[in-house]
């Protein structure tokens, strides 16, 4: 459906035009201050790369909905596509192939704990990436997605925060209840026939009922999810905490302000995660300590990874073999000190300034902003990285997000557009922020009234002169390349998949 709309709006020239185009509301560009938010949400100021899983793929396998789905991929292929490449693959087969090739993330990663895998590689004196490739090739190690009903591949703990998973966002709720939680359900659909089963996933005759060991939910309401949870943490609601929100329906940053303290045992979102990180760090002294992890990081869009398959031709793995970062996910060793999780939660890490930040392929240099945060938020000593800016309150975390995002800091936006202008040779992009370079939106401003965002390379709309936001106007009017291989709008009709 979306492709049909996008084809029509693109062919008619209405993309990037106020009143035209097709910018889906839900999830389109709701998270305005993305550059700073990504540093905070995924802890990339302290460690990279993060693990970020696709929700639909995770639950499709975890809730065993693939056992009931007989849809063939060819049914959804374009009439102009090379259907022979897709062949008789089921929907599940295409998902597994995409995960194994690194086109999509796949967590859990393998059928052995990554901490164990790195230790095995160390014991053999082999780089962990090389060891994993050898183990996969020899059949001693497998992708977890190939056997999601094997107990070694179950996700064991699920934390629900700001979501009524079972009552709202879960599609196929009865399968969540039956297979993920192992509780009463009204699922009545029959499993698919043997000849309809996916070829890429191991079929176990007895489907598991109850994969999770623990479901933890934090909420201020009693919902379908809290009723099915093992532990419920009472949460503060809107007028009991300091927080910030934005939406794709209008270009403003909003604050939540605490009128009262959270009653009884309720805690704010910030306090919940702060206290969990403190307890984890305390227990880690005796249990986990320092470990080396290995992250199977998917190939990134808006990056050179997109050039791994020239002309859209999918290589034959039997011919090329498994090559991390080329024909499979990147395999990145990451040192973890689990005793320092709390310390890192309370401070801004060094990587934002050292390695820079980036959104949608646009790099930002935020060294100056990190130094400014030392004065704005104060700083204190850490064992991990010396003196670091404080993030010990919710409002300090908000100020960090705003300081490091182009939509709220004109200097960051200008830096991003300067990087884009240098890469494209298009100096016209610099005009977009010549009147807002001095803008600095902070917590003190938005707690008084909503603040309107400014034009930033984080997104594709032009806000110059108070214009209403419309997606892709930046690309159409200022010739910023679209985020595609060609830099133009195109229709994905000439590749194998």
Give short role names for the model-derived ranges:
Residues 1-217, 222-497:
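Domain-level signature for respiratory redox metalloenzymes
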């Amino acid at each position: 459906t979306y492709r049909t709309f996008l084809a029509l709006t693109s062919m008619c020239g209405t993309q990037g035009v106020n009143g035209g185009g097709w910018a889906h509301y839900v999830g389109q560009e709701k998270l305005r201050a993305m550059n700073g938010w990504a540093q905070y949400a995924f802890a990339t100021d302290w460690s990279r790369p993060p693990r970020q899983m696709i929700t639909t793929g995770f639950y499709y396998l975890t809730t065993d909905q693939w056992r009931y789905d007989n849809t063939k991929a060819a049914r959804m292929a374009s009439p102009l596509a090379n259907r022979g490449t897709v062949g008789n693959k089921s929907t599940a087969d295409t998902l597994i192939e995409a995960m194994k090739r690194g086109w999509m993330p796949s967590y859990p990663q393998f059928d052995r704990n990554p901490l164990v895998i790195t230790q095995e590689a160390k014991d053999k004196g082999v780089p962990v990436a090389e060891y994993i490739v050898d183990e996969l090739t020899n059949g001693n190690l497998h992708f977890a997605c190939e056997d999601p009903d094997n107990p070694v591949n179950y996700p064991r703990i699920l934390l629900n925060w700001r979501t009524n998973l079972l009552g709202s966002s879960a599609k196929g709720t009865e399968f969540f209840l039956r297979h993920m939680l192992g509780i009463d359900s009204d699922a009545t659909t029959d499993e698919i026939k043997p000849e309809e089963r996916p070829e890429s996933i191991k079929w176990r005759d007895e489907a598991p009922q109850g994969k999770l060991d623990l479901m933890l939910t934090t909420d201020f309401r009693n919902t379908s999810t809290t009723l099915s949870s093992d532990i419920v943490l009472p949460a503060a609601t809107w007028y009991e905490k300091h927080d910030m929100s934005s939406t794709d329906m209008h270009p403003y940053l909003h604050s939540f302000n605490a009128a009262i303290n959270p009653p009884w045992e309720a805690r704010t979102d910030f306090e919940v995660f702060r206290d969990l990180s403190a307890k984890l760090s305390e227990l880690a002294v005796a249990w986990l300590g320092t470990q080396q992890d290995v992250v199977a990081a998917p190939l990134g869009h808006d990056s050179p990874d997109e050039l791994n398959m020239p002309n859209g031709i999918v290589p034959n793995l039997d011919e090329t073999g498994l090559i991390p970062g080329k024909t499979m996910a990147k395999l990145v060793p990451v040192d973890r000190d689990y005793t320092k999780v709390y310390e890192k939660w309370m401070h801004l890490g060094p990587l934002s300034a050292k390695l820079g930040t980036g959104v949608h392929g646009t790099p930002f240099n935020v060294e100056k902003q990190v130094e400014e945060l030392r004065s704005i938020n104060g700083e204190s000593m850490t064992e991990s990285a010396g003196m670091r800016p404080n993030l010990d309150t919710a409002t300090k975390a908000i100020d960090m997000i705003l300081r490091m995002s182009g939509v709220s800091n004109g200097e960051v936006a200008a830096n991003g557009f300067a990087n884009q202008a240098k890469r494209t040779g298009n100096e016209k992009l610099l005009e977009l922020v010549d009147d807002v370079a001095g803008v600095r939106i902070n917590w003190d401003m938005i707690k008084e009234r909503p603040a309107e965002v400014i034009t930033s390379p984080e997104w594709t709309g032009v806000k110059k002169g108070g214009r209403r936001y419309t997606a892709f106007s930046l690309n159409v009017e200022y010739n910023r390349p679209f985020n595609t291989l060609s830099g133009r709008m195109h229709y994905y009709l000439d590749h194998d998949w």
